[in-house]
């Protein structure tokens, strides 16, 4: 039974979007997470447990946060907190006549290309959620979502006090949808609005978590940090 505390769900810092290796933080991504750690340190935040996915960008985000905050408990890793494979999602959508756009998908290196990329990703995620798009290398959405629910149950039954969870936009959005009881593809819209290093909080109780805040950036509040707000 969980003593009252808060689950802090942190999306990783900015990664190297549109590069050959997205699973690494950019220099700005490192600074975003370090700033969150310093914000936690300034308010005397302590965590009883730390949980992450197994991706490099999760580990790097946690390391940068810890550098700003100081000592943290050893992290427990859950593969269920890893992001869906967006490249596989797009490939599956491009092979599906009902989803594929006319002509090739432009590279997401221009504003129009960026919009086209995320428009198709949004459609692919909705179809995957509905069970109408099979994505090679990815489980069915129901199985993926069940893995996230298992992590939330672990937090409820196996941890005490405040818990830090570092993951990606998809799992955090899916966890939020689970907590507020939003079914279908509601999680997709939440996912595509989550900002890098953003904080989402669930109030923990013996029965179930309750949404306390979503997608906040309390550590990026100065005019000088306005350009630190990123989405990929």
What are the residue ranges of the model-derived segments?
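Active-site metal-binding loops of divalent metal-dependent hydrolases
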Residues: 13, 169, 215
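Short, basic/glycine-rich phosphate-binding loops at helix/coil junctions
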Residues: 13-17, 117-134
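Phosphate-coordination/substrate-recognition cap region in phosphate-metabolizing enzymes
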Residues: 37-120
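Acidic, low-complexity terminal tails and accessory targeting/binding regions
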Residues: 1-5, 82-112, 142, 157-162, ...
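Loop-to-helix element that buttresses phosphate recognition and phosphoryl-transfer chemistry
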Residues: 5-8, 13-67, 140-145
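Surface-exposed cleft-lining segments at the edges of enzyme active sites
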Residues: 129-145
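Conserved nucleotide-sugar donor-interacting segment of glycosyltransferase catalytic cores
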Residues: 154, 168
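Glycine-rich phosphate-binding loop signature in dinucleotide/nucleotide-binding domains
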Residues: 43-46, 155-160
